[in-house]
Amino acid sequence: MSSGGLLLLLGLLTLWEVLTPVSSKDRPEFCELPADSGSCKGNFQAFYYNPVQHQCLEFIYGGCDGNANNFKTIDECKRTCAA
């Protein structure tokens, strides 16, 4: 195979890697945790990944404690956890 062909193949593989969504095997374990409002009494919009529905959903975060399945934006949740 010529060097041009190898470069094209490398470019296509790189593009495929970037565009392929997060698969369940690549998803961080904390994405499987349930929504956890925490122990504080705040009222903050947050998002968590729901592994049963395979989507990011809104919940109310109290402002402290909770767990790592807690995102400020739905886009951040999708980038991290959504397949």
Swiss-Prot record:
The keyword Secreted applies. This is Kunitz-type serine protease inhibitor superbin-3. InterPro entries: Kunitz_BPTI, Kunitz_BPTI_sf, Prtase_inh_Kunz-CS, TFPI/VKTCI-like. It is found in: Secreted. Expressed by the venom gland. It comes from the Eukaryota. SUPFAM superfamilies: BPTI-like. Residues 31-81 form the BPTI/Kunitz inhibitor domain. Its main location: secreted. One of its GO terms (molecular function) is serine-type endopeptidase inhibitor activity. Serine protease inhibitor. Belongs to the venom Kunitz-type family. It comes from Austrelaps superbus. Disulfide bonds join C31-C81, C40-C64, C56-C77. PROSITE patterns: BPTI_KUNITZ_1, BPTI_KUNITZ_2. GO terms for cellular component: extracellular region. The record marks K41, G42 as: Reactive bond for trypsin. Keywords: Disulfide bond, Protease inhibitor, Secreted, Serine protease inhibitor, Signal.
